[in-house]
């Protein structure tokens, strides 16, 4: 019996050691082979999601640029009164809420001879409705044609947006950017058109992607 117990003890010991060895090899195998592949897969999935969101964002910005091209080619065909009537429809885009507003900003004397500032700017109020804003035509307002966004827009190639750095003011709870694009009449500089875009739609795209 003692010999049998000794043999059983040895087998038990060998079995325990074998199990421990297999556990060690399994852990090492997972850490060395499986885990890196899992991390790579997770990283690739994350990168693919980021790329998809970036592509959608670029698509939304391209829509704004296409909208702006329509505006900058339409405005030179209109007289001053017609600009005020037509512009809200060009800006609104059937109530597209990411478009906070938009305007046209003629160079001094271009829209009305002898008039220094004669812009038309519409933006959304708290209910999402477009309302006209005449502040930039008032005497206390700085000259819009001297602002960085204006100068940047004047330098753009035909049909291309100059995107402003993100900013935030009291007019909206969300940060915004704007696309400024040059307007030319008869091949000569006439002014700049802007479309203000709220950046909140970035969050909406990310939220939909995470679902």
Describe these PLM feature segments:
Residues 47, 51, 58-100, 104-108:
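Extracellular/periplasmic ligand-binding regions of membrane signal-transduction receptors
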Residues 47, 65, 84-88, 147-150, ...:
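Extracytoplasmic/secreted envelope proteins and their assembly/folding machinery
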Residues 87, 164-165, 204-208:
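Short beta-alpha junctions and helix-cap segments that line functional grooves
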Residues 2-36, 40, 44:
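Extreme N-terminal signal-anchor transmembrane helix of membrane signaling/transducer proteins, especially
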Residues 19, 23-26, 53-56, 60, ...:
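Histidine kinase transmitter module recognition
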Residues 54, 58, 143-150, 180, ...:
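Amphipathic alpha-helical bundle/coiled-coil segments
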Residues 172-210:
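Conserved beta-strands of PAS-like sensory domains
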Residues 95-159, 165-173:
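Extracellular/periplasmic ligand-sensing ectodomains of membrane signal-transduction proteins
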